[in-house]
């Protein structure tokens, strides 16, 4: 194993790109470092950056395709090697680069016999095809293939909605994720109280963005998320002004037991034998309850809203989730 030597700043927080390469038109790699950081800071930044890289960056992709005289998505056409479904899967993989907003139209209109590739897509000037060699279909006979396409910019993964097939137009599962993968690692150095950390970020993209561009965009998105906290006090924003605010009522085991619905529905069942892992609580809420030694429905109903909010990192939203679960499964009218 070769040890890597990297010069780091001992005072000013700095970042640098330590490795960058293009493995192919649709696979870029970049490795970045940030230092010096105090103990714990590298993990905080690394986790936030990875989530922002994978989930907050927008991408452009084909979201709908239309072919005339095609009865359904799994049809086949004489003279085309692939089924319509396979053609749609190939269109889904086409990597596009664009800063467009809203929806744009594109098209393919070719005559066989020939191979159809991404180069045959007639797109608006604002849309660039990253890899024009990407395969779409193989025409084995002298037939015409015309496909109308819809291009959209979005983020994340959006599954096609069932029963949205209109006039030969079919939705395509949209994968608007320019970052294919992201990892972070931490290197500690120094001794005792002087111990510091270096954060390493590895980013793989699909070619529509370079890793450096992805890092910048993810950073901007994170900053935008935190800006409201910086200006909340200046603008005099108060919790009472929030129209979406909700009040969580207090509840106890005795109040719940007095409710006739729960007594009828759960008659003869010892509440202490019903464990909270049977209640479909979200993992975050479940973990905090377990850490607080709340294991059964009896434990759950023996606590009030105030008791739950005393649990470290527990939020009003978590209490509301508990109420929703109780109302759903035990018919408690809170």
Swiss-Prot record:
Keyword match Iron: no
Subunit structure: In plastids the minimal PEP RNA polymerase catalytic core is composed of four subunits: alpha, beta, beta', and beta''. When a (nuclear-encoded) sigma factor is associated with the core the holoenzyme is formed, which can initiate transcription.
GO molecular function, one term: protein dimerization activity
Chain's role: DNA-dependent RNA polymerase catalyzes the transcription of DNA into RNA using the four ribonucleoside triphosphates as substrates.
Pfam families the record matches: RNA_pol_A_bac, RNA_pol_A_CTD, RNA_pol_L
Region (Alpha N-terminal domain (alpha-NTD)): 1-232
Family note: Belongs to the RNA polymerase alpha chain family.
Region (Alpha C-terminal domain (alpha-CTD)): 268-334
Main location group: plastid
EC number(s) on file: 2.7.7.6
SUPFAM superfamilies: C-terminal domain of RNA polymerase alpha subunit, Insert subdomain of RNA polymerase alpha subunit, RBP11-like subunits of RNA polymerase
Free-text comment about domains: The N-terminal domain is essential for RNAP assembly and basal transcription, whereas the C-terminal domain is involved in interaction with transcriptional regulators and with upstream promoter elements.
Name under which the protein is recorded: DNA-directed RNA polymerase subunit alpha
GO cellular component term of the entry, any: DNA-directed RNA polymerase complex
Reaction catalysis annotation: RNA(n) + a ribonucleoside 5'-triphosphate = RNA(n+1) + diphosphate
Organism: Chloranthus spicatus (Chulantree)
Subcellular location: Plastid, Chloroplast
UniProt key word Methyltransferase: no
